[in-house]
Structure formats: C-alpha cells, structure tokens
Amino acid sequence: TKAFKAFGDSANYSLAPSGAFEAGSGGWSLSGASVVAGSESYKVHGAGDAKSLAVAATGTAVSPAVCVDVTRPTFRFFAKRTSGTWGNLAVKLRWKDSSGNTNETVVGTIETGTSWAASAPMSLSSVLPLWNVDQTASVQLVFDPENYGGSWAIDDVYVDPYGRG
C-alpha cells in the first residue's frame, strides 16, 4: 500500500507485525508501554482504527523481528509526544552480528510536538552489514524515549518492502 502518499512518499509499504495495534501488541516486547484508545489522525491503515501504542517516558517498545535485506530499505510510522515538553523519541534497530552479538543502531530521533505526524523514512538495510544482495538480517525496531523527557504514542508502523517508487 502507498500508506504515505499524502506525505509525498509513493513507495509501497507493508504493515509491520502488529504495527497498527488494533488487535493488541502481539509479538511486541513492552516495558512501560501499552495499547491505548486513540489512533493516528490520518487513518492510513483504516478509517475505523481506534488504537495506538503509548510509551511512557521511562518505557521502551520493541517490535517483533522483521526480515531485512537490501530490497527493504526503510520504515515509517506516526508519532506524537503525549507528555513533557523537551524529550525526544530515539528510534533504533536491534540486530545480531555474525558472531551472535546483539547491537543497537540509532536510525532516527523524533522531535515532533503533541499532534500526530508521520516520521521521515528511516533506514533499515543501509545501516546493517548487508553487502550482498542475497544477505538478510533479522531486526527489531526499538522505540525509546530519551532522557525521560516525555511520553510518546506511536501508531501504524510500516516497512517499505520494495525500495523506492
């Protein structure tokens, strides 16, 4: 689906596992986070959507694993600050290297205000050690409020499975 077309992005996206939060947070690892009433205001997933994920200032939300290769370059989502006035939302990729070590790579920081806004496209495959077309990696998306500066809501997490255009 061209979920972000209204924002000038004509790429095709697929919903990340449980990324709309309408049926709960199945597969997500939540600490200080929960599914709540209220959905992003653009309704890109569906007009009837009514839920999102609230992440407390001291919380963290980690998505189910997503398989990434060079044909899955970006992901996007909606976010808004729900409390606090200065805190940012750090967005990271959690992945394992060839030695089995877990790594986290910051791919973006959200500084939006108290209204729902679409994130910019954030890198998936370009920040991972994927040098060959046939290489894949399993990654998790980590949403982590920085420095306890405020709580956040996220919704409609999408992965670009086809590349640009």
Task: Please place each PLM-identified region on the residue numbering.
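Short beta-strands within extracellular/lumenal beta-sheet-rich domains
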Residues: 48-74
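Solvent-exposed strand-to-loop "edge" motifs in beta-rich extracellular domains
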Residues: 22-26, 65-70, 78-86, 94-96, ...
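Short beta-strand/loop motifs in extracellular/secreted proteins, especially
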Residues: 73, 87-91, 150
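Extracellular Ig-like/FN3 beta-sandwich strand-entry sites
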Residues: 70-72, 86, 134-138
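Beta-strand signatures of extracellular beta-sandwich domains
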Residues: 90-94, 158
